[in-house]
Amino acid sequence: MLASRSPRRRQILELAGWPFDVQESHADETIPPGTPPDEAVQLLARRKVEAVMSSFPDAYVLGADTIVVCDGRLLGKPRTEEEAFAMLRQLSGRTHDVWTGVAIALPQGSITSFAEKTAVTFWELDDEEIAAYIATGEPMDKAGAYGIQGRAALFVKRIEGDYLTVVGLPLSRTVRELRRLGWPPA
């Protein structure tokens, strides 16, 4: 069971070739001040899993959350176009970290989690480029105000780490963790 509203996470998990269902998770996405990024994404992923697992007690439930960190500042999803502009301006010409946390609930109710980090460097962006990207609407539902798998791919100068961590689900690590935990059942 995938506890997510993200079509990107659904598409990534389909690459594993296992059947799964999707249940939207409406968990609290606030992060306590001062929470380190690796802990923050695991906390949010766990909340998503916890919001869904009681309805599916016999299922493996997977949840994930992604944040962007630049200069020690956590960048979630922008609430306004102005906020998206400010985020993209901050990322312009710089390297930032993208963290994705994954939580997995087992049928017996225990939850395990992990976090993965990928460094992304953007080219220098001008205001017109940023405004044109925001006008597409693409950045509004994405951490850090960009989707690397969309038009923002044009902004990327370099990436160090797992590309799918930036998209929203580090698939190779997730599959290894699921196998370690007994999925798929024999």
Swiss-Prot record:
Catalytic reaction list: dTTP + H2O = dTMP + diphosphate + H(+); UTP + H2O = UMP + diphosphate + H(+)
First-level EC class: hydrolase
Record has NADP as a keyword: no
Homology family: Belongs to the Maf family. YhdE subfamily.
Name the record gives this protein: dTTP/UTP pyrophosphatase
Pfam families in the record: Maf
InterPro entries, alphabetized: ITPase-like_fam (IPR029001), Maf-like (IPR003697)
Cofactor(s) recorded in Swiss-Prot or TrEMBL: a divalent metal cation
Its EC number(s): 3.6.1.9
Protein keywords: Cytoplasm, Hydrolase, Nucleotide metabolism
Residues annotated as the enzyme's active site: D65 (proton acceptor)
Annotated organism of origin: Geobacillus kaustophilus (strain HTA426)
Annotated GO biological process: nucleotide metabolic process
GO molecular function, one term: dTTP diphosphatase activity
Localization annotation: Cytoplasm
Site annotation Important for substrate specificity: residues: R8, T66, Q149
Functional summary from the UniProt entry: Nucleoside triphosphate pyrophosphatase that hydrolyzes dTTP and UTP. May have a dual role in cell division arrest and in preventing the incorporation of modified nucleotides into cellular nucleic acids.
GO cellular component: cytoplasm
